[in-house]
Amino acid sequence: MSTNNCTFKDRCVSILCCKFCKQVLSSRGMKAVLLADTDIDLYSTDIPPTNTVDFIGRCYFTGIHKCKLKDIACLKCGNIVGYHVIVPCSSCLLSCNNGHFWMFHSQAVYGINRLDSTGVNFLLWGNLPETEECTDEEMLEISAEEYIR
């Protein structure tokens, strides 16, 4: 995976929520663009969401790139919210990318920018622990301030 000359450390960390049922899907989201079509906005995360989404349907390949994908659906409402890049193609691996393989459609999720430990500034990817994982209870305890922003 190529991240040379690419930096994502100044991007805000977002809590990703399903637009259909408001379920929190991930606490480690990042705004991104589709490598195959940079006009398409989406969100991505680096850690598989736990107990919030599951695979649905069969694997498929994209038309432009040869990545192997599988759709993911919200476990609460059942709507498709994105996809997982099961096998990225060499073109995507060699391009500037953030290393995230869990993608969320901007039409299906919304992001809430997380605050850092001061509660004043937005949390940035450069300050986020690589192995941070939240339990379901922790994700549900989102402060009112984070919802307002």
Swiss-Prot record:
Transmembrane segments: none annotated. InterPro entries: YPEH2ZP. Expressed at high levels in stomach and also in kidney and, at low levels, in heart (at protein level). In the stomach, highly expressed in foveolar cells, parietal cells and chief cells (at protein level). In kidney, expressed in endothelial cells, mesangial and epithelial cells (parietal and visceral epithelium) around glomerulus (at protein level). Pfam families: YPEH2ZP (PF14976). It comes from the Eukaryota. One of its GO terms (biological process) is positive regulation of apoptotic process. The keyword Mitochondrion applies. One of its GO terms (cellular component) is mitochondrion. It is found in: Cytoplasm; Mitochondrion. Keywords: Cytoplasm, Mitochondrion. Interacts with UNG. Belongs to the FAM72 family. May play a role in the regulation of cellular reactive oxygen species metabolism. May participate in cell growth regulation. This is Protein FAM72A. It comes from Rattus norvegicus (Rat).
